[in-house]
UniProtKB/Swiss-Prot annotation:
<feature type="region of interest" description="Disordered">
    <location>
        <begin position="157"/>
        <end position="212"/>
    </location>
</feature>
<keyword id="KW-0963">Cytoplasm</keyword>
<feature type="zinc finger region" description="C2H2-type 2">
    <location>
        <begin position="103"/>
        <end position="127"/>
    </location>
</feature>
<dbReference type="GO" id="GO:0005737">
    <property type="term" value="C:cytoplasm"/>
</dbReference>
<keyword id="KW-0862">Zinc</keyword>
<protein>
    <recommendedName>
        <fullName>pH-response transcription factor pacC/RIM101</fullName>
    </recommendedName>
</protein>
<dbReference type="GO" id="GO:0005634">
    <property type="term" value="C:nucleus"/>
</dbReference>
<comment type="subunit">
    <text>Binds to DNA. Interacts with RIM20, which binds to the YPX[LI] motifs and is required for proteolytic processing.</text>
</comment>
<feature type="compositionally biased region" description="Low complexity">
    <location>
        <begin position="193"/>
        <end position="212"/>
    </location>
</feature>
<keyword id="KW-0678">Repressor</keyword>
<keyword id="KW-0863">Zinc-finger</keyword>
<feature type="compositionally biased region" description="Polar residues">
    <location>
        <begin position="528"/>
        <end position="543"/>
    </location>
</feature>
<dbReference type="GO" id="GO:0008270">
    <property type="term" value="F:zinc ion binding"/>
</dbReference>
<keyword id="KW-0010">Activator</keyword>
<feature type="zinc finger region" description="C2H2-type 1">
    <location>
        <begin position="67"/>
        <end position="92"/>
    </location>
</feature>
<feature type="short sequence motif" description="YPX[LI] motif">
    <location>
        <begin position="494"/>
        <end position="497"/>
    </location>
</feature>
<feature type="compositionally biased region" description="Basic and acidic residues">
    <location>
        <begin position="905"/>
        <end position="917"/>
    </location>
</feature>
Amino acid sequence: MAYPTLPPNLLSTPNTYSDSVSPTDPEPITPELVSREPEKPAQKAAKTAMNNTSTASKPSESKGETLPCKWTGCSHISDSPDELYDHLCTVHVGRKSTNNLCLTCGWENCGTKCVKRDHITSHLRVHTPLKPHPCAVCGKTFKRPQDLKKHERIHTAEHHQLHKLSKAPTTADPEFNSRVSLSSATRIDRPRSPLSTSLSPTSTSSHSLHSSSSPFDHLLATGFHTDKSVSPTPSALALLHKKQHEELAAYQQKEMLVLQQLAFNQQQSQAYAARLAAEPFGTGAGAKRGQADAFHDLLSDVKKRKVEPVYDQDMIHRLNALVPPSLPTSFPTLPSLGGYNQYQTFPSFNGYPSLPSLHTSIYPTTAPQAQYSNQSPLPIPEIKTEADLAMFNEFMISLGRDAAANKAGPHPMTQSASGSGASNGYSASNSGTPLSETSGGVEDLFNAEELASLGLAGMPGISIHSGGSHNSNDESTHSLSDASPPAVSFGGLYPSLDAMRNRTNSAPDVSALSGAARRPIAGLPRTSMGNAHNTSTNQSTKPSYLSGMFGHSSSQQYDGTTHNYLHGLSNEHHNDYSHSANNGATNAYASFDSLARNKQSFPAATLAPKMFHNKVYRDVAPLGTAVSKRARESAERTNVEDSDREELYADQESNHGYAVSNERAREERTPKIPVRSLIASIRTLSPSTAADGEDDLKLPAISPSHVEPGTDLPPLYSIQRGGHSSGQYRRASSLSSNSTSTSGSSSFNSSLAPSNVASGTTTPRGSTPPRGVPTKRHTEDEIVRGVKRLELGPAEPLRSTTPELPDSGTTEQALERDQKPDISALSLSSSPTPPSNNPPPSVSTANEEGKDMTIEEMRRRHAALIKSWLVAVNLQWRRKKMEEMQRQQREEMEELEEGGEAMNVDERERERVEVVA
C-alpha cells in the first residue's frame, strides 16, 4: 500500500496545527487543515525540512523518477518506496525457509550485521524513503512515532541541564516545550507535526499518562521553558538547589529517626537479655504472654485430669513459670511465714466493694524474686461453670498443702461433694495435717479457718466446716463437724452440703492423714451407699480416674531435700470394710496391692568397687591340644567328670576313629606322676627315706649328696679349661632344687640317668658334658603327654625356703623348721580381707542446711503463689456472680417499672374512656 503524495498547494499554505489526534500509532501521512491563523516560525522550519526531504527522496509523478536499488551487484529499479522495500526484503534478505536468509546489509557503504530477520528488515527502512515522522526542530525523519518522541526530548532545556555537552538545538516554541516537557498530571492533547496531523476524530486513547521526560521536571516552575540558551538560568539553578537541599534534609531526618529506633531496640534487647540471665528458674521476665499461656495450660490439664496435685519436679517447673495474679491491694499478710514477711506489692485493680480487701504481697523481696517487681500481674482466667471452679479449688488446695509440707510425703487428695461437679474433684483434708510438725508454720495457709477468713467459705470445692472434731475413742479418726457454716456465705447460689450429697450420692470425706501408710496405692475403687457422714474408715484415697492414668499405681512421693522421686509399694495389704450404722449399707474399700507391678530394686550408687559374688570358672586349654579335646583334657587334669561335655564330644570322638582310641589307650597305660613327689622336701634326700620305693620317680639332685655344705664352687677359669677340680660343692636347698626341676624338660631328663640317682654320683657342675652324645629334643606332643601325667594331690602347706644352718645337728630341729609356715606364702594367701567399717565421707552439714533452707524457701513461695491464685480465681468468680445478680435485679426492677408504667397508662386510658362516656 502506497501513501498518497501531498499536493503542492496544500504544502505551501498550511499555517496552523490540527488539534485532532489519531487513535492509533503510527499515523498515515495526511494533509492538514487550512487555518486562518498566522504561520509560526517552527512550522516554517518544519515545512522547509519536509519539502527538502520530499524533493530528495520522493520522486514526483510528473517527472517520472524511479528508485534504484543500491545493493551490491543489484541493478533493480523500483517505481515506489514500498516496491523497493519489498524487493529488499524478498530478494536480498530472503527467508530461512527458502534457505536464502541474509542478515548482513549489502546496501552501498553500509555493512550492518543483525542477528534476526526482523532486525534487518527494520534496518532497511533507513535506506528507503519510508520515514513519515519528521522532527519539527531539526527535520530528521523517523520510521516510528515513538522514535520521534524520544528524539524530541533532546531539544528541551531540561535535557541541556542534565547534559552540559549536548549540541542539539533548542526551540523557544511554548507549544513544543509544553507538549514534550509537560508532566503527566497536566497533560493535554499533544499537537502533531505538520505532516503527522490527522483528520480522524479525537480519541480518548491519546490521553494516556506518561512519565516525565526528566526526573527533575517537577523541580521547575510551571511554564519555565522560554529560555533560548543551552545553559540553565541562575533562577532555575537556585530553584533546583533549594529543592535538593530540602530533600536532603528530609532524608537525613528520616535516617536519624531510623537510627534512633534501632538504638532503642538494641537497648531493649540488652535489658531483656539481662533480665533473662538474672532469673533463677528460667522464667521470662518479659514473657507475659508465655506465663499466661502456662497458667491456662495448667488449668486445661486440671480439667482434662492430666496432672495430679503432687508437688513434684514437673509441678515445680509449672509454678516457676507463673507470677502472682492481680489482686486487691489489701491482701492480709501471712503471720505464719516467720521471717519471710517482707513482701513486694503488685499492681492492683479496683473491685470488690462489699468484700474484705486482699493484699497482693505474695513473694518476699529476695534476690531470686527481684524480677517480679518489673512484671505486671497476669489476668485472672475466666471459669464458666461451678464444676470447673470446684475442681480448681480442690486441686489448688491439695497442691498447696503438698507444697507446704516440707519433708512430709505428698498430701493425698480426697473426694468432696461441694459444688455441682465435686463427685470427681479434689478437696482439702481436715485440720489434722502433718504440716504443723514439719512445715515450719505454713500449715495455716490452707486450713478451713484461714480460707474462711479470706471469704472463701462456701465456695464450690472448699470445705465449709471450720475444723475437725476429734473422736474420743480414736485420736487418729477425724469426722466432719456438724456445726453451721461460717457467717460469710453466698446467699442461695449454692445448695447445702447435705442436699448436694443426697442428690449426687457422692463418696464420703475421708481423712487424709490417718490412713496414709495403710493404703500405698492411690485411687482404689470404692463403692458408697447411704449417708456419707456415718463412716469410720481411716483410709485416704485419690480420685478413681487417677488410678491407672500414668501406667502405675504406686504412690509418687517427692523428697524436698534431694528433689528425687521415691517410688515404692508397701508390703502391707489390707482390705478395709466399714459398715454404715444408719442404713446398714456397706462402704467397701478394697485393696488391690497384689495387682501392682513389683519395682525392681537397683543397688545404690557408690564410689566403692563392685562386689562380684558369683565366680566365673573357665576351662583353660593346654598348649598344643586340639580344640575338640580341650574339655576332656581339662576334666582329666582336675578329676571332674562332666557328663554333658562327654555327650557333646562323643560324636566328635567317634568321627576321629582309630587314632583317637589308640591315643586314649596310650594315655591310660602311661603312669601318673603325683605332684607332691616333684616338690621334694629336705627329708626326701635323707638316708631314712631313701628306701621308700619311689627312687625311680625322684628327680636328680643338683649337687651330689656326699658334698659337704659350706664349700664354694670351682673358679670360672677352671671351668673354661675343662679341668675337673676336686673341690667341694655346697649343697643347695631342697626346695630350690625341686622348684627348678618342675619344668617339663627336667621331668623327662629324670629317666635318662636312673643309675646315677641310685649310686649317688652325677656329673659335676663344673664339668662339660660329652660332645658326642646328642641332646634329645622333645616334641610338643611328648610335652603334652608329660604334663598330663602330673596328678594334683591334696593341698599341702608350702615349705620354708630357709636353708639348713650348719650347726643344726638334730632331726627334730629340721622338722620344726619344715613345719613353720612360709611368710611369703601367707602374704600370697587368697583369704578375703575383712571389709573396712569406715563410713564414706559425708556431705558437709552446712551445705545440707543451706540446701534445706533454699528448698524450704521455694516451697514457701510456691505455697503463697498457689494461695494467691486460689483467692484471685474465687473472688473473680464471686464478683462475676454478684454482677450477674445485680444485673438480674436491675432487669427485674426495670421490668417492674415498665409494668407499672403500662398499668398506669391503662388506668389513665380507662379513666379517660369513662369520663368521655
